[in-house]
């Protein structure tokens, strides 16, 4: 379950002004990167679901951050379907980012009061995103 609610996460992102996006298959390397970012003032970190062992590494990062980086909101990126979003939310994701807008992911996140930032690459995709979303990720097409 998420440690921080939607508003807290969005405030952390706003106050930091950026969100590092990272993946590595080695949990120890990933922990060092999370800690370095935290020590540098980052309070929201996106780990991407893009490679081998992503689920296992993410679970370790969440546990590590709870102890070593208590104000860090750990989110998951590259999410394209609701089942994967739900799995990462069970592992402790505080926010979900995707390369596209998927209304089913939005429902999963909204039920849990977790921030969802869909990617949009066209005006049409922006138009499909509900008005209640305050953050969209723009992608070049």
Where do the PLM segments sit?
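Conserved N-terminal beta1-alpha1 strand-loop-helix module at the mouth
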Residues: 2-74, 79-82, 90-91
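Surface-exposed charge patches
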Residues: 11, 35, 86, 107, ...
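Catalytic beta/alpha-barrel core
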Residues: 45-50, 73-79, 93-101, 115-121, ...
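Acidic-residue sensor for enzyme active/binding pockets
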Residues: 46, 125, 140
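Active-site-adjacent beta->alpha loops and helix N-cap segments on the catalytic face
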Residues: 49-64, 83, 98-111, 123-127
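Feature detects long, helix-prone N-terminal segments enriched in hydrophobes
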Residues: 78, 84, 88, 116, ...
